[in-house]
Amino acid sequence: MNSSNPRYGLVDREYGIQLATTSPADDGPVWMVNLMKYREVADYVDGRKTTISGQAADDLYSPIDSLTAVGAEIVFLGDVDQQLLGDNTVWDRIAVVKYPTRKSFIDMQARPEFQESHKHKDAGMDKTFVIGCQPLQAAEPPPDLEPLDWADVPHPPTKDDGPVVVMHVLRFEDVDAGVQTPAYMEAYK
């Protein structure tokens, strides 16, 4: 890994500078969505021989202490069960981390324990996207929407079922159009 970019992705330097230099008056929480694709076998840059998987190496990385030190919290962590739609990348894991400020995201990366454990992430990751987000207000359901009768569903949920989380990550080719809901998503409203 060089000082600019890890082997598993390209750093958007402009966004990094924005995160680091946002004035305290304008700063606030940021949610970082992490899409992770692991190497089949971990590949350490120091040349050590290993048979552990990329996911196992990333589990060694686990930056819980660094996150806690800057006031961040993991709000979602899950292994991908199914990928319904997307390009050629089939993601293995998704994490969403809420940082109290944009600067705290940068501060975490300067912590010695983070830098020491990062070698495991570098060894484990084939590719990752880290996407800074701000939550949107969910649309209110139409007033005439009737609740679903689970008796009409072939495989209704049971009290033993866990939650299902669906994450839809959009990439807009036309950044100016990114503030508008794509026409094909109007049906979701």
Language-model region placement:
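A common structural junction motif
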Residues: 113-119, 125
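Short S/T/G/P-rich N-terminal loop/turn motif that feeds into the first structured element of a domain
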Residues: 1-93, 100-108, 124-189
